[in-house]
Amino acid sequence: MTTIVSVRRNGKVVMGGDGQVSLGNTVMKGNAKKVRRLYNGQVIAGFAGATADAFTLFERFEAQLQKHSGHLVRAAVELAKEWRTDRSLSRLEAMLAVANKDASLIITGNGDVVEPEDGLIAMGSGGGYAQAAARALLNKTDLSAREITEAALNIAGDICVFTNHNLTIEEQDLAE
C-alpha cells in the first residue's frame, strides 16, 4: 500500500507520500508519485490503495472540482456520492486525501468525507505510525508543517514494509 500524510500549521498545508508500489509481497516500483496538484495547482491530492483505481478517482475528482468551480468540500461530497452509487466505481480500492487553503479531507469509497478536527491526515498501510509521529510533533515541537510531514513519513518508512523513503511533498500557503 502506501503512506500519505497531510499537516496544516502556521499558514501552510503540506501533503506528502512515499513512492513504493507493491504487488503482493514484491516491490514493483519505488518512485511512484502518489501526491499531485489538481485544479490549476489550487488543490493537493494524494492516494493510498490500488494505483489504477486511484488514477480513476483523481480524474473523477478533478471533474467534480471543475464542475463546482474548485469548491473542495462540494466536489468531495459529490465524488463520494458517485463513488458509493456507481457500480464500476464501487469496486475501486483506494482512498483520497485532498487539501486546499480552506480544508483538508479524506474521501473513502464508503461515501465518507471526513475533515479531521486537527488538520492532520495520515492514511494507508503506514498511516497509524505516521499519525502518531505527526501528532506528537504537532503537540510537542515548533517544527514546520513540511518538517512534520517529512518526519512522519520517514518514521512510517522505518516501520512499515509497504512504505519507503522516496518522498513526494507538495506545499501550499493558506493565503493563496
From Swiss-Prot:
- Cellular component GO terms, alphabetical: HslUV protease complex; proteasome core complex
The answer, when asked if Metal-binding is one of the entry's keywords, is yes
Q: Which CDD domains match?
A: protease_HslV (cd01913)
Activity regulation annotation text: Allosterically activated by HslU binding.
Residues that bind Na(+), according to the entry?
G157, C160, T163
Q: Provide the active-site residues from the annotation.
A: T2
Q: Which GO terms describe its molecular function?
A: metal ion binding; threonine-type endopeptidase activity
Q: Which reaction does it catalyse?
A: ATP-dependent cleavage of peptide bonds with broad specificity
Q: Which InterPro entries match?
A: ATP-dep_Prtase_HsIV_su, Ntn_hydrolases_N, Proteasome_sua/b, Proteasome_suB-type
Transmembrane portions of the chain: none
Q: Where in the cell is it found?
A: Cytoplasm
What biological process terms from GO does the record include? Answer: proteolysis involved in protein catabolic process
Give the Enzyme Commission number: 3.4.25.2
How the protein assembles, per its UniProt entry? A double ring-shaped homohexamer of HslV is capped on each side by a ring-shaped HslU homohexamer. The assembly of the HslU/HslV complex is dependent on binding of ATP.
Entry function: Protease subunit of a proteasome-like degradation complex believed to be a general protein degrading machinery.
Q: Would you tell me the protein name for this molecule?
A: ATP-dependent protease subunit HslV
Lineage of producing organism: Bacteria, Pseudomonadati, Pseudomonadota, Gammaproteobacteria, Pseudomonadales
